[in-house]
Amino acid sequence: MSATTQEKGLNYKVKDLSQAEWGRQEIILAEKEMPGLMALRQEYKGKKPLAGARIAGSLHMTIQTAVLIETLTELGAEVRWSSCNIFSTQDHAAAAIAKAGVPVFAWKGETEEEYWWCIEQTLFFGDKGPNMILDDGGDLTAYVHEKYPKLLSEIRGISEETTTGVKSLYKLLKKGELKVPAFNVNDSVTKSKFDNLYGCRESLADGIKRATDVMLAGKVALVCGFGDVGKGSAASLRNFGARVIVTEIDPICALQASMEGYQVLRVEDIIEQVDIVVTATGNDDIITLEHMKAMKDGAILCNIGHFDTEIQMSRLNSEKGVTKKEIKPQVDKYTFPDGKSIVVLAEGRLVNLGCATGHPSFVMSCSFTNQVLAQIELYNNKYELGVYTLPKHLDEKVAALHLEQLGVRLTKLNQKQADYLGVPLNGPFKPENYRY
């Protein structure tokens, strides 16, 4: 047996259990800002729709995720958890969950080896394996398919949180390698158009400012990618007064960016002039070593896509003559042989979680309410192999659960108006193919 599997079945591994009370107080605060999850607890109180579910979870171990985990357990599930990023864990959140009796394996600053060890620990429920997977980014899903394929026969479904993981699911499906039905939570409107857009609009600038104390007003910023995450990122910087330039491969997204007032160029057109570079593409090698060498002295480089492949960090770290100096955790200055330096945040990983605390609780309530509904749906109903999205009526339900807290009063159709539009009186109000 490997050193990893010899240690399987541990109850938890966190950085500092003494932080549990701090974490618990922040969880209580977050619950007030997460009306969707709290409403599901009330709706299913006593019904336990996840009784018997053994959920292996891999998702950023934050305060907001703690509220998700405790919602799953209140609905009857048994849960084991790891983070999906080596820097994203909030140690007080992990401590609070461990203290509450949920097996959690996560701490900020894991090594790559520790990261995969933590993921493996989510798979051992005594003498049983998981029968559900809740994933963010696809690492847990891929790990089970590659390392523990025997567990797949017991797994009823996978719910995937983010764009990168969804791409991976569709790739597996296309190649005939996906063995379990999955829900694409990311493409729920109340996830992608809220978490990806409005969440990034607040959390990107938060991460950059906490890391560097830089004033964004007047700076020239380059945002690579103008999908939902890129749209939120560009708005985040613009709202603080930065002049934002966008790169895109997609003519539709490029046209959207231009009509929002952003200049759309190629990286090589502008890299020498920008003060801040943010990657938000979900792709590889967006910022190359050559780009980094061409950047202004003191420029800031960061990523808000799921993985660290968007910036060529391995080439930067191995380049002869380049020196690295840690300014503080997750803030590193790289100096080139010509004397110029750049500041790289979170080692090229998610800057909003590596250098700050991620998205606000309210918008994560939208995302995580989708996750809970997907888990209930997959656990209680048998799906054929495929990748599915939540039906429109559940998407609208997620939105509705968050309106009262914002003081929203919905207009109600009468029957004549509903008939005229050709929609049910109480929704869904849009066809499945409607683009918000």
From Swiss-Prot:
It catalyses: S-adenosyl-L-homocysteine + H2O = L-homocysteine + adenosine. Its main location: cytoplasm. This is Adenosylhomocysteinase. May play a key role in the regulation of the intracellular concentration of adenosylhomocysteine. HAMAP family: AdoHcyase. NAD(+) binds at residues 162-164, 196, 225-230, 248, 283, 304-306, 352. Keywords: Cytoplasm, Hydrolase, NAD, One-carbon metabolism. The lineage of its organism: Bacteria, Pseudomonadati, Spirochaetota, Spirochaetia, Leptospirales. It comes from Leptospira borgpetersenii serovar Hardjo-bovis (strain JB197).
